Amino acid sequence: MKRFVVACATLAGVLSLVPLIIDAQQPPAAQRPELAILYTVDGFSDKAPGRVKLPNLEALMAQGAYFRQNWTVQTADPSNGFPPSPWAQNGYTSSIPNVVQMSGTAMLLPGKQKYVQDSFFPLKITAHVVNEISYRSLDGSFHYTAQAGGTGMRAAGYKVGNDKTLFWATTFLREVDPTFMWIHMQDTGVAAGESRNAPAGSPYKDNIWGEGSPYIKALQQQDVYLGQFVDTLKKTGKWEKTVMFITGDHGEQTAGGHPANVPEAWTMPLVMVGPGIKKGVTFDYTESIDTVPTLCYLMGVNPPLNADGRILAEALVNPPANVPPRQQKIKEINLLLLDIENVLAKLTAAPGAAPARGGQGRFSALRQAQQDYFDIERILEWHQFGTYDRFIEHHKELLARLKTMSPK
């Protein structure tokens, strides 16, 4: 316990210095954008820019920085299960990747976590627009919100699509002069699900890239809306002072959907454009936790205190000094957890291998291993490790232990 208290005290001391460090690294006020927009395309596959003609997105890619793969954590959504999961019991109503992206960290602090909008609220106007009610647990510290949609509302006859999101986004843009906006276009995620439910013989059955795919159509229509939104920014005189981050909340598997254990669902593109961002550059890798620290740096505000993503210095005209080199911790964690999941599945499927509730032998060892496994649905406990390196080390040791239990 003493070691834990000392560690917490040390962490508190470090965090107390964060505002001073960030302030020292922020760009001069004259160079800062006046509006930051996080523009989320639901279920935005990293393959989309290469497979679908998206002229408005392509134009922004040429004007800014393009990251081919933006990695998020495993794409679980434990918000709707029964009995309620710890995730739901802590009040979260969306999938895990949304919360991670808005926090700038995968080391979430249940009950205490702050989000990017808190970096502006209350003195700078914030706005959130989405055609889905699942993100309501992330809606704090937004002055203006328009959210409606989702499975239940559609079943009840409400037609709330991306067109409504565009309407409210442009309305807020004109009427309330926001400094930060989170715009979430939901229709692509809904359309991807139609591939799973398509009748047998359909060219897009279990294939979002098949001929006539609703997902492709939704991507193309969303690109039209993106162009219209950018036109509104230009007509209102805001474009030259706006920085935009266009990405997904998660990717999409070819069959449609975003199961936690499917790598296709973990990656989406990221396009950054606006003042302070290099033009016409392309990079291979980033992480969703990097978006908030980079956005906050450009806007001259402090990110959430526990945000540990990396400022994307390689994409910036005037990056801060001493940005650490690129690592791939989120990718490493995802693949490590997938390996553990696969080994556990084999062990528990072995004849008579149900974990015992006590006693000696391999069964009780397996039960202990399961308790030591902090999978994605236990993400609210990850912060107890303190760092990603410690989390990774723990799970590498767990994987090695599990492999010794494998049936001969």
Tell where the protein language model's regions lie, with residue ranges.
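Bacterial N-terminal signal peptides
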Residues: 8-19
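Loop/turn elements at helix/coil->beta-strand transitions in domains of secreted/extracellular proteins
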Residues: 32-37, 63-68, 120-126, 175-183, ...
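Membrane-interface soluble catalytic domains
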Residues: 25-32, 231-237, 253-261, 268, ...
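Catalytic-site neighborhoods of secreted/periplasmic enzymes
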Residues: 97-160
